[in-house]
């Protein structure tokens, strides 16, 4: 299975509440809320190289209750970049201790690159998992996700996602760069 995504960065005049009001009629599942803190790791030879198809990225995600900050779960994910942007094979497992997982990756030679801190509201439409992400340092986004068979035409699926996003008539722009790369690029610029 591959994960196919499309992201849309919202203009600063749109709030999360505005967005929920616009999208609510399309939801077919209740909205869940979570605070996700992702620690991203790369192999040493990838640190200064562009992410290309076949690149391997490790992520340790701590999911917290947004109200209490209590840890709900930790996940470790290997992402193998696909041929198209925002398309990857993902291999994921729950881990009992996110800190231990980060230490193991470091001991194996993986280098911690960036941390992504976001509040995610998640629901489903008929066709997609839809996420409203408030990403620290980046702003407010809509992210559409779908799991598809390995031989699915990711380009066609992303085009359909782009049409869905454009039909919402919300101010903003398509965003083709993953959150982790966007935040990393900010730190390189500054």
Where are these regions (language model features)?
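N-terminal strand-loop-strand beta-hairpin
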Residues: 1-127, 170-190
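Hydrophobic, well-ordered secondary-structure segments
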Residues: 3, 141, 158-162
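A generic structural motif
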Residues: 10-12, 147-152
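Residues forming anionic-ligand binding surfaces in small-molecule and nucleic-acid pockets
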Residues: 77-79, 137-145
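Short alpha-helix boundary/capping segments
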Residues: 93-96, 149, 153
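A short, sequence-level motif marking secondary-structure junctions
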Residues: 94-95, 135-139
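Mixed-charge, glycine-accented linear interaction segment located at domain edges/termini
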Residues: 150-178
């Amino acid at each position: 299975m591959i994960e196919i995504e499309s992201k849309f960065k919202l203009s600063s005049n749109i709030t999360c509440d505005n967005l929920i009001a616009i999208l609510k009629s399309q939801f077919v599942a209740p909205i869940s809320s979570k605070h996700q803190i992702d620690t991203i790791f790369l192999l040493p030879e990838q640190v200064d190289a562009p992410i290309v198809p076949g690149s391997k990225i490790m992520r340790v995600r701590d999911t917290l209750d947004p109200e209490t900050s209590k840890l709900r779960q930790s996940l470790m994910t290997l992402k193998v970049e696909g041929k198209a942007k925002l398309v990857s094979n993902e291999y994921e497992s729950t881990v009992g201790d996110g800190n231990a997982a980060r230490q193991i990756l470091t001991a194996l030679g993986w280098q911690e690159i960036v941390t992504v801190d976001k509040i995610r509201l998640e629901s489903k439409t008929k066709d997609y998992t839809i996420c409203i992400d408030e990403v620290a340092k980046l702003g407010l986004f809509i992210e559409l996700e779908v799991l598809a068979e390995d031989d699915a035409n990711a380009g066609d699926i992303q085009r359909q996602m782009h049409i869905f996003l454009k039909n919402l008539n919300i101010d903003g722009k398509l965003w083709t760069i993953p959150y982790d790369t966007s935040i990393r690029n900010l730190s390189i610029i500054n």
